[in-house]
Amino acid sequence: MPFADFVAALKDNPYFGAGFGLVGVGTALALTRKGAQFGMIAFRRHYMITLEVPSKDKSYQWLLSWISHYAKNTQHLSVETSYLQHESGRISTKFDFVPSPGNHFIWYRSKWIRIERNREKQMIDLHTGTPWESVTFTALGTNRNIFFNILQEARELALKQQVGKTVMYNAVGAEWRQFGFPRRRRPLSSVVLEQGISEKIVQDVKGFIENPKWYSDRGIPYRRGYLLYGPPGCGKSSFITALAGELEYSICLMSLSDSSLSDDRLNHLLSVAPQQSIILLEDVDAAFVSRDLNKQNPTAYQGMGRLTFSGLLNALDGVASTEARIVFMTTNHIDRLDPALIRPGRVDVKQYVGHCTNWQLSQMFLRFYPDQTAGQSEAFASAALSSSDKISAAQVQGHFMMHKTDPDGAIQNVCLATM
């Protein structure tokens, strides 16, 4: 059969014509779909702007709060439970609804913004056990200012929730994470130290914060170290907490006896500590002791973790140590500390915080019972010191708590409380 006749026969075949038509339609639809996909990709690349924020970024929680503030009409929600501490000290539970994983649309400054919250089910954070998440913002246009404005608003919204409070951070892995809920700032006047001690430290810290240029002009590393030492319960940690509130700083808590703490991790944590924060190393004598004692008891000197003594020294003032840093250390036994740890440059200010004096006892009495006279406060101080000359601030506070509304009872029973 000639080829021309074969083609003519195919044209006259209705089944072939129908099949060829379907193939043509399918091909056209496929090409149209591919063209639409490429067109959408090109449109998004040239006429849309996208911002992705992973859950490890510090602004992630800020943005979730911001989204819940703007996406009030969304019907797909997740719940976040938090605790609130009231002025009275009472703690209540608060439930916040945030958009669940998926796509959400909000109207912001005359623009529609698509928000996609993704949750990876196959990957989790080993420290918290929570899945990895990310939030992606997509908007029309190429102006980045819209995302900058969103981040600024989210930050301001988060800061409003922390006004009048002190934020505590704890070292988790290679980063600092907020520990618990922000605490009400403790007034500096609520911690009564011996006359002049509080004022001396506050003046020194503020002078350090306000004069970075003085350090740079003289080539001095811009960092400051403090050591508060003395018997337990005398107000060392309480004063640091109140000082952070006075400066409107946060506190970064770090345990040197943490078994997972190594030299590299300590260096990294000190370098990424939140700005405007005090790094607090409590009970440093529990992690390291004097090298003289090391010869007698090498196991105790090594501590519980992988952190070495030389690693700690280098982190405090070595070549790789960071600047613009305030470190407070506390100890109950300064004699157990190696002189190399507390030399100038690593510890610039050493301050003894001891047992209560007559003046301290009088001031504490007047603070708990502001309506009482100076004569009654002196009577309380004299009675307390006559029974013992080693009274801690924690003991006095516990005694006052037993006589909240009975100042006379506090004076009469002080001997029993200090025995």
From Swiss-Prot:
Protein name (database record): Mitochondrial chaperone BCS1
Main location: mitochondrion
GO cellular component: mitochondrial inner membrane
Reactions catalysed: ATP + H2O = ADP + phosphate + H(+)
Documented EC number(s): 3.6.1.-
Mitochondrial matrix face residues: 33-419
Membrane disposition: Single-pass membrane protein
Pfam family name, one: AAA
Keywords of the record: ATP-binding, Chaperone, Hydrolase, Membrane, Mitochondrion, Mitochondrion inner membrane, Nucleotide-binding, Transmembrane, Transmembrane helix
GO BP of this protein: mitochondrial respiratory chain complex III assembly; protein insertion into mitochondrial inner membrane from matrix
Subcellular localization(s) per the UniProt record: Mitochondrion inner membrane
The protein's role, per its UniProt record: Chaperone necessary for the incorporation of Rieske iron-sulfur protein uqcrfs1 into the mitochondrial respiratory chain complex III.
Residues that, per the record, bind ATP: G230, P231, P232, G233, C234, G235, K236, S237
Cited InterPro entries: AAA+_ATPase, ATPase_AAA_core, ATPase_AAA_CS, BCS1_N, Mitochondrial_chaperone_BCS1, P-loop_NTPase
Recorded family membership: Belongs to the AAA ATPase family. BCS1 subfamily.
Mitochondrial intermembrane side: 1-15
Transmembrane segments annotated in the record for this chain: 16-32
Transferase recorded as keyword: no
Keyword Transmembrane: yes
GO molecular function: ATP binding; ATP hydrolysis activity
